[in-house]
Regions:
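Bacterial Sec-dependent N-terminal signal peptides
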Residues: 1-21
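Metal-dependent C-N hydrolase catalytic cores
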Residues: 24-26, 63-129, 287, 291, ...
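Short N-terminal amphipathic alpha-helices
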Residues: 53-54, 81-82, 267
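Active-site histidine-anchored catalytic micro-motif
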Residues: 20-67, 109-204, 209-210
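Short, well-ordered secondary-structure micro-motifs
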Residues: 94-96, 173-175, 215-217
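Conformational coupling and interaction surfaces
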Residues: 21-22, 39-51, 183-315
């Protein structure tokens, strides 16, 4: 009887802990720039705070991106997390069809495979299943978001929040005072317009806060010395991407906005996407979005380093 009571208490504690975790989905273009890998690693290493419902891939060779995500999950012992491929758009131009160097890390990996469901359908299903409970991270071109809106125009409004690495509002690349057509916006301008006009609760981690987050050589060396499955994967992918360049962790900032809201300053404004891929602010209109305008960069880097070094993910 005492054993049954003890088991019951343990079960209730487990259920309570799960209930307190934030449900999340990540939509990403893993494999191009290296920042997607650091974003996924931050999310995976934060399973004490996140209940990860799944990862979806977007833009270009979504099958190769999904294969890369599957291997990363397998290496860290988290292969139960589903991976769904978004619509393959590798035929739109040469850039979209690029076989990125990071893909070689997972080439031929077949121990875990993506689910059959498309990325858009997976996200729709999860948002319908858990209305107002899910944070959807969007850290790539928003082609999947467009597909979702066209299939189910109201469903993005069921997300508790969408946090998107998207846009350039007051600041451009490398801190320039001149704004730029940010990559995730300009890759699919039609999709970007639909996304910002979707009526969803969207928080934008644009260049205003992401362009300052640099991962220098000393930081990378600390990861290398950690020697864990997750940090080894990051180091391998970083080397394939570039052995010398300093990464900007654009996408990891989007994850950080959910983990560490105290490090960010935001502003509610009305934004729209123009025909050239600029994200324009119109302060004469009622706000339709929330944009990041400030970040405590040093503290953010310190915190994510702690997460990477203290995790013990593995098989």
């Amino acid at each position: 009887m005492k054993k049954l009571l003890l088991l019951g208490i343990i079960f209730l504690v487990f259920i309570s802990a799960q209930a307190q975790k934030q449900k999340v989905i990540l939509d990403c273009d893993l494999g191009d720039d290296i920042d997607d890998a650091y974003a996924i690693a931050l999310m995976l290493a934060s399973t004490d705070k996140f209940e990860i419902l799944g990862i979806t891939t977007c833009y270009g060779r979504t099958n190769d991106r999904a294969e890369l995500a599957c291997k990363l999950l397998y290496e860290t012992g988290l292969e139960q997390i589903p991976v769904a491929m978004g619509r393959n758009t590798s035929n739109i131009d040469e850039r979209a069809n690029w076989y990125a160097e990071q893909y070689y890390w997972s080439k031929g990996f077949n121990k875990v495979k993506p689910i059959r469901q498309s990325g858009a359908d997976f996200i729709i299903e999860q948002l319908r299943k858990y209305p107002n409970e899910v944070i959807l991270f969007s850290v790539g071109p928003v082609t999947n978001m467009k597909d979702i809106i066209e299939k189910d125009p109201q469903v993005l409004k069921l997300a508790k929040k969408v946090i998107a690495m998207f846009g350039s509002f007051y600041v451009g690349y490398n801190g320039s005072p001149t704004i730029n057509p940010e990559w995730n916006v300009k890759v699919d301008i039609e999709a970007s317009k639909k996304f910002v006009n979707s009526g969803a609760n969207i928080v934008y981690a644009g260049l205003d806060i992401t362009t300052f987050v640099k991962w220098d050589k000393m930081m990378q060396e600390r990861l290398l010395y950690r020697q864990s499955p997750l940090t080894n994967a990051l180091c391998s992918l970083k080397t394939l991407w570039s052995n010398t360049a300093t990464p900007t962790l654009f996408d990891a900032v989007a994850i950080g906005m959910a983990l560490y809201p105290d490090l960010f300053k935001t502003e509610k404004v009305f934004i729209e996407v123009d025909d050239k891929g600029f994200t324009r602010i119109d302060k004469t209109k009622n706000p339709n979005s929330e944009i990041g305008v400030g970040i405590n960069t040093d503290e953010f880097l310190k915190r994510i380093m702690d997460v990477y070094l203290k995790q013990n993910l593995g098989r």
